[in-house]
UniProtKB/Swiss-Prot annotation:
InterPro entries the UniProt entry points to: ARM-rpt_dom (IPR006911), Armcx_regulator (IPR051303)
Chief location category: mitochondrion
Family that this chain belongs to: Belongs to the eutherian X-chromosome-specific Armcx family.
Region (Mitochondrion outer membrane (MOM)-targeting sequence): 1-6, 26-36
Location of the region described as Disordered in the Swiss-Prot/TrEMBL record: 35-54, 69-99
Domain of life: Eukaryota
Places the protein is found: Mitochondrion; Mitochondrion outer membrane
Residue ranges that the UniProt entry lists as topological domain Mitochondrial intermembrane: 1-6
The protein's name: Protein ARMCX6
Pfam families listed in its UniProt record: Arm_2
Amino acid sequence: MGRAREVGWMAAGLMIGAGACYCVYKLTIGRDDSEKLEEEGEEEWDDDQELDEEEPDIWFDFETMARPWTEDGDWTEPGAPGGTEDRPSGGGKANRAHPIKQRPFPYEHKNTWSAQNCKNGSCVLDLSKCLFIQGKLLFAEPKDAGFPFSQDINSHLASLSMARNTSPTPDPTVREALCAPDNLNASIESQGQIKMYINEVCRETVSRCCNSFLQQAGLNLLISMTVINNMLAKSASDLKFPLISEGSGCAKVQVLKPLMGLSEKPVLAGELVGAQMLFSFMSLFIRNGNREILLETPAP
């Protein structure tokens, strides 16, 4: 009995000693872990403080957010016109690119003449004695996007009004024809008046010196009529040969423009001016060595 009791007490002592050693070990390791956690927490806090100090310079550039384009007008940020921007799609983490619609005015402009532009041009013509400046104003003809080879009718009518005031003509019928387009509200009546005097306008245009204001006004009137009425078909057939064979380069270009306009809309010209006749005039230009003039004709 005494021997068994001693063995029992020995086993109990070993168990108590092992438990005490384990407790001491856990207390030591736990203190080290807590110190490491505290150090990591302090490092994270320092990082957060540094980010808070840098955020105003990095993330909040309000000028860039309000104006997402460069000084030259080029868009450099996501969501620019004609580009794409990332939007989160529902139900998932992935982002999808969505097209951005083209922005309207002031990002796109139209090349047209307003009433104020015409008034300013008329004032410049009245005050300027320089023939070069006057010619530049009269020859300015914005293109009509719906009819590539025709010119904007309003700009032609404005140039007619300016040419009428600048270059008087002895023929009263020509003056009446140049005055007729002034009343835009009575366009049908104006077309009738122009039709009465169209032959005189063609004769006066051919007889005048090349590149004169009156010749330019007559050609502008004829170009306008190719767009709105077929009255030019017969008159153009009488006009084009003298100017193409004897006129200057500018006159040849101006005569070829209404011909190309008529060929683009054959309903207006009927059978008088068609693709075959236009081809014959192009051949005439090529035979005379005026290829550069032919290349300038479709240009604005």
